[in-house]
Amino acid sequence: MGCSPSTLPPAPSAGQTGERGSLPLDASEKDESRLFCIKLRRSRLRRCSCGGVTLQPPSDGNGSTAGDNLCGQVLLNPLQTKSEADYEKLSTGKKDSIVTVAALGNFTHSVVRRATGSTGTSGTSSSGGNSRPGHRKSSLALALTPEDEPMDVYQRNLMDLKYPTVLPPNPPLKALLVFHKSDSICEAITAACQRHQLDVTLVKSKEEALDTLQKSYATAQCYHLIIIDARSSKNLDAEHIARTIRHTHGHHLTTIIAVCKKSFFEKDDVLIALLDAGVNRCVAETTNLAMCSVELKQILHSIIRPHNVMSTQQALYTALHRLKEVVLITDDLLRIQYANRATERLLNMRLDEIISKQLEDIFVSDLSTISEQCKNIKEFDGILTVRRKSQEGIPMHVRVVPVACIGSAPTHLIFNFDVPGGQMDFIATLPQPKEAPRGSLHSVRRCSFDVRSIASDGLRRTSLAKLTSLPLEAPITKIINLLSQVQENCSADEARLIDKVLEFLKREGLYSPQMKEIRTDDPIATDLIGALLTGPSVYSSRRSSNDSIIRTGSSTRTAAIVPAKMKSNPIIMELLDESLSWDFDIFKLEEITDYHPLLYLGMEMFRRFDVFATLNIDENVCKAWLAVIEAHYRKSNTYHNSTHAADVMQATGAFITQLTNKDMLVMDRMEEATALIAAAAHDVDHPGRSSAFLCNSNDALAVLYNDLTVLENHHAAITFKLTLGDDKINIFKNLDKETYKSARSTIIDMILATEMTRHFEHLAKFVSVFGGEEPRDHNPQTDEETSILMRRMLIKVADVSNPARPMQFCIEWARRIAEEYFMQTDEEKQRHLPIVMPMFDRATCSIPKSQIGFIEYIIQDMMHAWESFIDMPQLITYMQINYSQWKKYDEQGVNTLAEIMAKQPPVGKMANSK
């Protein structure tokens, strides 16, 4: 606890000493010198049983002669920087303590001596002199607490000057007491906290405690100490409270104390359970204020102070991680313990591949010299060859510093790499932090970089030649530069071809859909593919005064939605046992669950993939969420209903299982959970009409989303609106802020990926990344992007996997989607709207031709690409069988929906409703 600068009284004349025995001040110094002072708590100085002398404090100083907390002030003149020590001996006004401060340049040493004699004479010896008879030396280092830590550099010790440290946080300490009632023990603890100047807040229930913690975190006023009444589990479940606090964001270093009955200390299982739940220390109940005060003092020094220091280390780790220089830390056996982000880029490896690796695995050079020098506490400085993953070695200047954390032998080695000037090009091509603003050097990093985007960032008059001379090392810049160099030394024909290539590279949307040529004699396929892959802008945006077909203001009806009986129906359970099989009968599940396939299948998938534990949520919350999501799928839709959602979710689960079995690019638990959630909600509240229809009818959703990705944006938005709108179904409520943000981003991205207008773009990117014959090495530059591509392709294939299902399921899905398209065409005719798919007329449409075109132009390439990645040959097998069947129907003249139903009766609940 610092105090304001003080002023010394005028110094006595040269050779004159004051009545306190002070040494004379230099005559060149001003009479009034600005001084810094440290307040010393009297609790640090134990009173002696023997009498001492009474010394009077300065008459005009700031010393305290009254009060129990302070024994006075020690004044230090920063101008005292002589080579030898000058001493200011000041008394505290107490009979038992003398405080001496020695100023040696910028180093200050403070000692406290206690008088042990009873002669009544004052001890005046310094730390460098001989003690007078009747006195003994007693040097006590001042262990300052955070609130006492001086902020001026003059109070740093010699070790701090050699190895500068970051001061720990220095806020006013706050304590939260969780007691079900304010009894005598609670009052004693409160008084002890107040004695040590802690700001105390008392709450009386778990809910009130958690609410207080959340509010304090929101206002950046966290509690440093939480004391929980653990004497009776009937009143407060201390174990549950402690565990909940530990899982609350921002409280992993909060000190938690449990007040227990004395009898608990005879039962180690009770105390161990509390400690395992996150309690730092268990203390026995007592109403003795002195005992509470001493116990609290120990906690402040032995737990809270170290926790503050530990929290400060995060600043150092963050600084290390963001350094452009490469930093490695190993143990004494040369096993890598830490690597920063620059190391990841240098070695072309992920951090989890680097940590715990032997250092010899990344160096080509012999490391014996380093080991020998570091054993003798000598630094190493030399050139070593670093082995990058899948690339040749690079000679680099390396400095190695041994550090002895415990004892005198080195426990860690710090490696610092300097990249030689000739090897700097590799660092510029690697991705930089995402948070870098667009237009900065760090933002120029993706393969889809468009040269023209530079113009929007203030370089409008920069030519391409000048651009390539800048230190912008994006891959597209290198490609253009290399092609320009090749063009200078090639024939005229080759130069013209390169010009065309350069022109394509300068365009936006390198992966934009390129429609394959469709036979002009196949108008149905033309209509279908055109409607799926073309944006709504090609249609007229005719205004209509008709009401929107989208329901608005629908409320969350949790209680009325969940089926009355959701017991373990043996038929349902037997069917769900095969829920990960590609032959799973989703239509049978639709029938036996009475139109609730998503609820039952969703709960089964959540259990199989441990989603409850991943989201840290109760099963009933997930059940309620699935029920609400399913209720917002419209039963009036023949295709885009909850059965389709359940089918996509089932396919997603099957794909995740296959990825796990192959141990290739395995998704983590959170990615699996978000993929299943996205699949379940990817078409929620679908109106049974296409985005083009909504745009043509001037629907409110089309206006809201500017005619762009209308339905998919609505599905993603309504998913989070429903989820966050009711705490009873909020499956994300126990996630921390960063995890929720990441999960939300993944779910939205996967739902938007189901939009067919970007089908070829996603497919082309996926093939360009995963289409190589050679196995792909892990690369931290692209792992995140490839994971995104993989998740997008996963849900895309799951969404349109109907032609790759067993034939009876494929035909039923074709019947349902055709019926939905027919209903849209009927409404377009009735409302005099542009006909999006004119050939989808129920009287004239050829279902086989539409499916043949869909497989040829959409499904075939995507299924082959996905199957080669995931290794599920049944996808191709079923697709070929179904394609042959549709060809056969077409040759037989089986075209209309009625004819198809006669050949292949509908299956599932929808069949019974016809």
UniProtKB/Swiss-Prot annotation:
Give the knockout phenotype.
Basal levels of phosphorylated kinase p38a/ERK2 are decreased significantly. Increased sensitivity to oxidative stress-induced death.
- Alphabetized PROSITE patterns for the sequence: PAS, PDEASE_I_2
Q: Where is the composition biased (Low complexity)?
A: 116-129
Report the InterPro entries cross-referenced here.
HD/PDEase_dom, PAS, PAS-like_dom_sf, PDEase, PDEase_catalytic_dom, PDEase_catalytic_dom_sf
Instruction: Cite the GO molecular-function annotations of the record.
Output: 3',5'-cyclic-AMP phosphodiesterase activity; 3',5'-cyclic-GMP phosphodiesterase activity; metal ion binding
State which Enzyme Commission number(s) the record gives.
Answer: 3.1.4.53
Q: Provide the residue positions that the database annotates as binding a divalent metal cation 1.
A: H644, H682, D683, D799
Which cofactors are required for activity?
a divalent metal cation
Which ranges carry the PDEase domain?
558-893
PAS domain location is 312-359
Q: Which UniProt keywords apply?
A: cAMP, Hydrolase, Metal-binding
Q: In which pathway does it act?
A: Purine metabolism; 3',5'-cyclic AMP degradation; AMP from 3',5'-cyclic AMP: step 1/1
Gene Ontology biological process terms from the UniProt entry: cAMP catabolic process; cAMP metabolic process; cAMP-mediated signaling; mesoderm development; positive regulation of ERK1 and ERK2 cascade
What is the uppermost EC class here? hydrolase
- SUPFAM superfamilies found in the cross-reference section: HD-domain/PDEase-like, PYP-like sensor domain (PAS domain)
Q: Which family does it belong to?
A: Belongs to the cyclic nucleotide phosphodiesterase family. PDE8 subfamily.
Specify the protein name. Answer: High affinity cAMP-specific and IBMX-insensitive 3',5'-cyclic phosphodiesterase 8
